[in-house]
């Protein structure tokens, strides 16, 4: 046995730990990673993992590739042993009981799911379901697009578009005004995106990460909307719309939950990490866009300040803004200066 001195033992000791905040709000979950290796110093890194996990549904094959492994079994989800909300959503389960993160199923939403997956729409959204978590529905739709039955994981035919974007690593989510044919902010609210007409106004541009001298034989950006009609794109707009609705629902519920708000009082830097990630979804909803502009004008000091503006948008008067394409992102300009950029969200990759 090799001799272990004190230095070896110290180096071998795990000096990092992680914890999750807002686990009961699937799109708002924030992961805190703390490293205590520094003397008298705890370094904390915050990341908005809830939104990151939600965005990965836009690349179904990469997101669910582990489910194709032989012998893979999903964790059991029963009333006696309920799964944590995060784990349940990632596996396409829906809660057996009502909770505040759910929305009511409307005829427009059923029609949208039927248009996205004509053959398996009844499995994705059963007729008996009247309330559902938007992210659970997005996961089930994404699983079907990846070629997996959302109930038993039996392999089916994947959507051709999911094959096209499988090796991409990021996506820029855009909204357009169909009447004027230009980039715009969805002014009708996120709920409008859960209809066929609303989801059709969402465009997605997929891209590849190129680091250093690594060259990939692929274009810098891929827009499924420019592909032939045999590549369906409505499901991409539906998934993006469900993410936006989940964000609005969770922010509304967090504003009324004082207990969860108290858990954030010791983590003021978490707000900045959350807002940076939220900017990728800013064009999907006028409420989300207003929140991002307000943060750009005067950064929120903590989550309580963010929720005050969310609940009372009139507290912050925002200037007239314009959108401009700047390289791989969308620049939001106001008062003659750049307020923030709508950047591409990472979506994993094969």
Curated annotation (Swiss-Prot):
A Pfam family of this chain: PolyG_pol
Top-rank taxon, per record: Viruses
Keyword Kinase carried by entry: no
GO molecular function: RNA-directed RNA polymerase activity; single-stranded RNA binding
UniProtKB keywords: RNA-binding
Known function: Protein that binds to ssRNA and may be involved in genome packaging.
Subunit structure of this chain's protein: Homomultimer.
Name the UniProt record assigns to this protein: Non-structural protein 2
């Amino acid at each position: 046995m090799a001799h272990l001195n004190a230095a070896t033992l110290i180096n071998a000791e795990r000096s990092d730990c992680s914890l999750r905040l807002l686990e009961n709000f699937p799109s708002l979950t924030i992961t805190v990673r703390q490293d205590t290796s520094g003397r008298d110093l705890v370094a904390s890194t915050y990341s908005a993992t809830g939104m990151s996990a939600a965005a990965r549904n836009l690349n179904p094959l990469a997101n669910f590739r582990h489910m194709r492994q032989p012998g893979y079994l999903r964790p059991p989800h029963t009333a006696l042993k309920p799964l944590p909300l995060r784990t349940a959503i990632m596996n396409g389960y829906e809660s057996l009981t009502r909770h505040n993160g759910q929305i009511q199923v409307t005829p427009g939403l059923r029609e949208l799911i039927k248009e996205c997956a004509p053959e398996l729409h009844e499995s994705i959204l059963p007729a008996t379901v009247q309330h559902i978590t938007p992210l659970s529905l997005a996961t089930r739709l994404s699983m079907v697009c990846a070629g997996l039955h959302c109930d038993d994981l039996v392999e089916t035919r994947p959507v051709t578009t999911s094959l096209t974007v499988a090796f991409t690593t990021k996506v820029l989510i855009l909204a357009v005004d169909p009447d004027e044919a230009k980039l715009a902010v969805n002014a009708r609210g996120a709920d409008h995106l859960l209809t066929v007409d609303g989801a059709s106004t969402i465009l997605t541009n997929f891209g590849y990460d190129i680091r250093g001298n690594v060259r990939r034989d692929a274009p810098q950006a891929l827009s499924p909307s420019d592909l032939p009609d045999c590549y369906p794109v409505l499901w991409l707009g539906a998934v993006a719309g469900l993410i936006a609705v989940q964000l609005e629902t969770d922010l509304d519920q967090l504003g009324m939950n004082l207990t969860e708000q108290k858990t954030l009082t010791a983590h003021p830097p978490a707000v900045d990490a959350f807002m940076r990630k939220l900017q990728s979804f800013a064009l999907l909803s006028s409420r989300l866009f207003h929140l991002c502009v307000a943060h750009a004008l005067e950064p929120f000091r903590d989550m309580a300040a963010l929720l005050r503006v969310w609940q009372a948008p009139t507290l912050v008067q925002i200037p007239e803004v314009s959108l401009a394409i700047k390289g791989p992102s969308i620049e939001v300009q106001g008062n003659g200066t750049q307020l923030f950029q709508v950047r591409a969200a990472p979506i994993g990759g094969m």
